[in-house]
């Protein structure tokens, strides 16, 4: 990067005003707010940003964090938010969230949500991948809301830009194919340390500021689903279904990208037979333009009979276990 490019980027990061939006679970929101709003106020004061979290709505499982300021200040503020989420202190008596003291705040990242967009797709790396236990503890996932135009700019031509961001900043990223309900916004999931996320957000916001014009794309707003909207999807590994007004049941099974082909089968024959046998509809999430083998794809099971959903879920998981074991045995045989 030339001196002039560096100067231009520095000017952009300090002068341009941007707004960053994150999708949060209720527990994440409560932890960020802190007792009587002390934590979010500290982020606001330390970084000279306007930051707030959308109102909590009854029967709604998500909230939106909105942060506005210079690119540098906003990116640093989100880095501080990551540090709050990584901290192990327990939220108590939060007037805004009405959450009771609960050790579950210490395992936010491991929680499974009924609302599918809250579930992270990038699995946390293993110690073997990171090679440092302390660094592993500092890795976190966040969900950044981006419009279609912004997402296209971030991905770049043939995915070149997102590849460069991943390599240069030491993060992992994946963009969802689906837009959030009643909106034109998608999720950009970012995984890394707080510092790495801060740096990559500076790059991302500079790209958006320089290349994306203001559009009329509809922003996502947390809301309770209407009667004619799809039923909430169950993501719990032990099933417990969601029941809609027309008696429709849904469940989600996440399959690692490396195993999707085997689960679907040649020309889709294996998944077709599973659909037929279980009498369910199984919708497979489209493959993202940039995805690693350890990322996961969503298999959504739908039926008006809960037993059929449970059967299909059980069969999918069994097929995955069988394929994992088969590959393990092949590796052992080849290395023998």
From Swiss-Prot:
Coiled-coil segments on the chain, per record: none
GO MF: RNA binding
Compartmental location: Cytoplasm; Cytoplasm, P-body; Nucleus; Chromosome, Telomere
Q: Where is this protein primarily located?
A: cytoplasm
Q: Does the keyword Nucleus apply?
A: yes
Alphabetized, the UniProt keywords read: Chromatin regulator, Chromosome, Cytoplasm, mRNA transport, Nucleus, Repeat, RNA-binding, Telomere, Translation regulation, Transport
Report the leader peptide range: none
Where's the KH domain?
A: 17-81, 139-204, 248-316
Cross-referenced PROSITE patterns, in alphabetical order? KH_TYPE_1
List, alphabetically, the SUPFAM superfamilies matched: Eukaryotic type KH-domain (KH-domain type I)
GO cellular component: a single term:
chromosome, telomeric region
One Gene Ontology biological process: chromatin organization
According to its UniProt record, which protein family does this protein belong to? Answer: Belongs to the HEK2 family.
Self-association state and partner proteins as the record states: Binds RNA.
Functional note: RNA-binding protein involved in the correct localization of transcripts in the cell. RNA localization is a widespread mechanism for achieving localized protein synthesis. Involved in structural and functional organization of telomeric chromatin and regulates silencing at the HMR locus.
Please report the name of this protein according to its UniProt entry.
Answer: Heterogeneous nuclear rnp K-like protein 2
What species was this sequence derived from? Answer: Vanderwaltozyma polyspora (strain ATCC 22028 / DSM 70294 / BCRC 21397 / CBS 2163 / NBRC 10782 / NRRL Y-8283 / UCD 57-17)
Upper lineage: Eukaryota, Fungi, Dikarya, Ascomycota, Saccharomycotina
């Amino acid at each position: 990067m030339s001196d002039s490019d560096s100067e231009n980027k520095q000017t952009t990061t300090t002068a341009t005003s941007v707004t960053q939006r994150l999708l949060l679970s209720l527990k994440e929101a409560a932890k960020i707010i802190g007792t009587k709003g002390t934590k979010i106020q500290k982020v606001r004061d330390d970084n000279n940003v306007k930051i707030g979290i959308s109102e909590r709505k009854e029967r709604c499982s998500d909230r939106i964090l909105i942060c506005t300021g210079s690119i540098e200040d906003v990116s640093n503020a989100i880095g501080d938010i990551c540090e709050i989420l990584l901290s192990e202190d327990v939220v108590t008596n939060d007037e805004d969230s009405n959450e009771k003291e609960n050790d579950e705040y210490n395992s936010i990242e491991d929680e499974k949500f009924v609302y599918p967009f809250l579930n992270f797709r990038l699995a946390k790396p293993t110690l073997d991948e990171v090679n440092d236990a302390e660094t592993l503890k500092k890795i976190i996932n966040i969900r950044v809301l981006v419009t279609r135009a912004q997402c296209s700019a971030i991905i770049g031509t043939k995915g070149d830009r997102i590849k460069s961001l991943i390599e240069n900043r030491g993060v992992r990223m994946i963009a969802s194919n689906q837009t959030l309900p009643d909106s034109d916004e998608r999720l950009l999931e970012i995984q890394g340390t707080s510092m790495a996320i801060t740096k990559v957000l500076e790059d991302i916001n500079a790209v958006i500021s320089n290349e994306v014009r203001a559009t009329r794309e509809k922003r996502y707003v947390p809301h309770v689903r209407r009667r004619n909207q799809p039923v909430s999807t169950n993501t719990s590994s032990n099933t417990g279904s969601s029941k809609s007004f027309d008696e429709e049941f849904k469940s989600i099974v996440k399959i690692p990208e490396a195993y999707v082909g085997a689960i679907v089968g040649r020309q889709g024959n294996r998944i077709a037979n599973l659909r037929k046998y279980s009498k369910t509809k199984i919708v497979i999430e489209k493959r993202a333009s940039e995805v690693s083998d350890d990322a996961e794809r969503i298999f959504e099971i739908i039926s008006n009979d809960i037993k059929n959903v449970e059967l299909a879920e059980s069969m999918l998981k069994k097929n995955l276990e069988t394929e994992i074991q088969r590959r393990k045995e092949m590796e052992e045989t080849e290395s023998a």
